[in-house]
Swiss-Prot record:
Organism: Methylobacillus flagellatus (strain ATCC 51484 / DSM 6875 / VKM B-1610 / KT)
Protein name as catalogued: Pyrimidine/purine nucleoside phosphorylase
Cross-referenced InterPro entries: Ppnp (IPR009664), RmlC-like_jellyroll (IPR014710), RmlC_Cupin_sf (IPR011051)
Similarity comment: family membership: Belongs to the nucleoside phosphorylase PpnP family.
UniProt catalytic activity: a purine D-ribonucleoside + phosphate = a purine nucleobase + alpha-D-ribose 1-phosphate; adenosine + phosphate = alpha-D-ribose 1-phosphate + adenine; cytidine + phosphate = cytosine + alpha-D-ribose 1-phosphate; guanosine + phosphate = alpha-D-ribose 1-phosphate + guanine
Amino acid sequence: MAQFDNVSVKKKANVYFDGKCVSHTVLFPNGTRATVGVIFPGALTFNTGSPELMEINSGACKVRLSGESDWKAYGAGEKFTVPGNSSFDIEVTETLDYVCHFE
């Protein structure tokens, strides 16, 4: 999907890790939400409240889910899921353009 139609977007940006991750919240008519943003190169750890589906639009990264020892590489057009009440480490090698869907 190249665009979201009939949605609301929160104007205030979500800025994390001293600006290394910047996103905006998108609210869908059915009550679900997502964030659309970028993560700049570096290594970060994110905590999750609800399950997440991360869609990579462009860029490159490696991800390691909580409790796992192996890293998995992701690039444009790929997705990964993260359980709720968990965390994941991410190493971004090329600025990541992403959509994070909250389930």
